[in-house]
C-alpha cells in the first residue's frame, strides 16, 4: 500500500510540474484512478464493498470511452469472501487487459498471480521480498519480479505471541 501511494503521489506531482521522489521518471499525462482510501457511508446507505464497486465501474466506463488512465487497485474486493474475491478479481483483470491501460494491482492472494500466465504480455508479477534472519524481518525495499515466498504474517503472529 505504501508503494502504491508513493507511485500515485509521484504521478500527481509530476503532472503539476513538481519534483518527484525518484531517480528518474517518465510518464505521459493520465488521469489517476485508485480504490485506495475507499470508505463506506451510513448517510448514503453505502457499504465499503459497494463504494469500491462504484469506483471500479467508473474506471471501466472511462476505459470503454477510450480515455488514458492509470489505475491503482489495492486489495480489491475486500468486502466479500475469498472465493468470490478471487473470481471477481480475475474477471476484472481479464476485462481490464482488453484495454490499453496501465495499472498497478496489489494483492496478497497468491492465486491471483496466475494471471501472469494467462496474459503474459500484460500482467507482470512484482513483489518486495523479505528475509527472516536471527528472528527478525529484513526488508531490502527492492521491487523484484515474481511472487514473494516469505510468509511473514504467521512469523509476526508467533513472534508477538498471538498464536
Please place each PLM-identified region on the residue numbering.
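ATPase nucleotide-binding head domains, primarily ABC-like/P-loop NTPase cores
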Residues: 1-163
